Structure formats: structure tokens, C-alpha cells
Amino acid sequence: MTMGDKKSPTRPKRQAKPAADEGFWDCSVCTFRNSAEAFKCSICDVRKGTSTRKPRINSQLVAQQVAQQYATPPPPKKEKKEKVEKPDKEKPEKDKDISPSVTKKNTNKKTKPKSDILKDPPSEANSIQSANATTKTSETNHTSRPRLKNVDRSTAQQLAVTVGNVTVIITDFKEKTRSSSTSSSTVTSSAGSEQQNQSSSGSESTDKGSSRSSTPKGDMSAVNDESF
């Protein structure tokens, strides 16, 4: 048989494996499998389809990865407790240095016994303080406000209004009648003016009479002197 008659043994052709991971692509630099929608690698930001002849690794990302790998674990919480306990131990030493007068002042402040504190709950104390504050403010308001003159105090009508836990009493007064007061004042003023006019006219008449009576006496005295 010649060379041409030889036949190559029949081999089954390689069939393409079913691509189970269609759409995913591996990065040529970091070999990370990215999704089909990604245009760049999600780790090293390398574009899809770049060659690996001269790979350009991002130095910042490498530094971050190294820092994460060799990052020191967070310190345990026991150290914090020790730090808190240290100043507590130092406090008694500082308290010893304080003069006894300061300690006496602190003891004098605690005059109220514990039994009284238990008897008076904080809610009642707050309510008493608020009531005292309201009474003080009401007293200051009453003292500062001037009283009205044209008001009859005899005619007073009170109206109580309650809003929640607060009750407000409103007092209404009527004005004084101005007609009688004005007429009496005008009469008294006119009578006073007439009296002033009469007194002024009487004083003028007395002055004239005194001047007339003084002149003839002077003349008579002069005539008597001449006769002598």
C-alpha cells in the first residue's frame, strides 16, 4: 500500500462544551469572574478584552488588600475597663489631699434624712415647686399692674374657665357713669370762678375806698398847719 492509501484513524471530533457560564467573563489581570453587564472589572477596574502582555496592576488596590490582610485586630474591651479602673484608683489619693474643710461642707449639705426623701416623691416636690412659682408670678403681676380709676368695683362678675388642669377666673367690671361726675365738676368749677371774680372785685373796691379816704385827711392836716 502506498502512502496515499493510508487513512488516518477516525477520531471523534471535539465537541464544544456547553457553556454553562455564558455571559460571564474572566478578568485578564486578576482572574475575577465578572458578569456580562460589567464593562470593567469590579476589582481592578480593567476594561473587558484587554491583553495580559503588560498587566498594569493598580497600586492603590494592592496596598488596600495588603493592609486588610495584615490589619491588626481591634483591641479587646478589657483594656478599656482597666483604663476606667485606673482613674478610680487615683481618685482616693486625690481625696486624701483635699482639706478637711471641704469635706465638712459636703457633710453639711446632706441635712435631709433618707426617710424624708422616701416620704416625698419627686412628683409631689415638683408640683409644690411649680405651685409656688405660679403664686409668685401671680403676685408680681398683681403688684406691677396699675389699677384703673374709671371702674366700679361694686359691679363685679366672675367667670371661671378650665383648660385641662388649669382654672382661670375672669372678673368683669362696669365703667363709672361719667355724666353725673362731669356735671358736678362743671358746676363746682363755675361756682369757684364766680367766687374768685367777686373776691377780686371786692378787693378792688376796698383799695379805691382806702385811697380816697387817705387824700382828704392829708389836705386837712396841711390846712391846720398853715393856720397855726
UniProtKB/Swiss-Prot annotation:
Keyword Cytoplasm: yes
Predominant subcellular localization, coarse grouping: nucleus
Biased composition (Basic and acidic residues): 76-98, 113-122
Paired cysteines (S-S): none
Record keywords, A-Z: Apoptosis, Cytoplasm, DNA-binding, Isopeptide bond, Metal-binding, Nucleus, Phosphoprotein, Repressor, Transcription, Transcription regulation, Ubl conjugation, Zinc, Zinc-finger
UniProt modification remark: Monoubiquitinated.
Zinc finger intervals, RanBP2-type: 21-50
Subcellular location field: Nucleus; Cytoplasm; Nucleus, Nucleoplasm
Modified residues (Phosphoserine): S99, S123, S127, S130, S227
Tissue expression summary: Expressed in embryonic stem cells.
GO MF: DNA binding; transcription corepressor activity; zinc ion binding
Domain of life: Eukaryota
GO BP term, example: negative regulation of transcription by RNA polymerase II
Record field: compositional bias (Polar residues): 124-143
One Pfam family matching this protein: YAF2_RYBP
Region (Interaction with GABPB1 and FANK1): 143-226
Comment text on domains: Intrinsically unstructured in the absence of binding partners. Folds upon binding to DNA or RNF2.
PANTHER family per UniProt: RING1 AND YY1-BINDING PROTEIN (PTHR12920:SF3), RYBP AND YAF2-RELATED (PTHR12920)
Full protein name: RING1 and YY1-binding protein
Source organism: Mus musculus (Mouse)
